[in-house]
């Protein structure tokens, strides 16, 4: 079976992200749309809001870090950017997470 997790490194901490069915349903409710719709907007040059990216990462952390919430993820993203990363790099993590969760083919 393929590994369905994505590693998200912040400082010296490595977080495992994974979206199972329950997390996908929660994500759709929180975003008010399917993440697939968000990905289609990317193809048209649109970008997700920072709030949407935080929501995706927070929900992606729930399987392996059940106490994670959006406020804690916002703090992690501050550290992520301070470490020299960009929100575009974060978007790559999100696309990989959505790919491994089955929203898009992994070959894309």
What role is predicted for each listed range?
Residues 1-14, 33-45, 65-108:
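Charged interaction scaffolds used for protein-protein
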């Amino acid at each position: 079976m393929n590994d369905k997790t994505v590693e998200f490194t912040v400082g010296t901490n490595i977080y495992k992200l994974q979206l199972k069915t329950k997390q996908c349903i929660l994500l759709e409710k929180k975003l008010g749309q399917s993440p697939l719709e968000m990905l289609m907007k990317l193809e048209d040059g649109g970008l997700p809001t920072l709030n949407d990216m935080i929501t995706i990462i927070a929900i992606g952390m729930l399987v392996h870090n059940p106490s994670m919430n959006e406020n804690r993820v916002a703090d992690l993203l501050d550290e992520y950017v301070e470490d020299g990363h960009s929100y575009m790099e974060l978007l790559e993590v999100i696309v990989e997470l959505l790919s491994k969760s089955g929203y898009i083919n992994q070959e894309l």
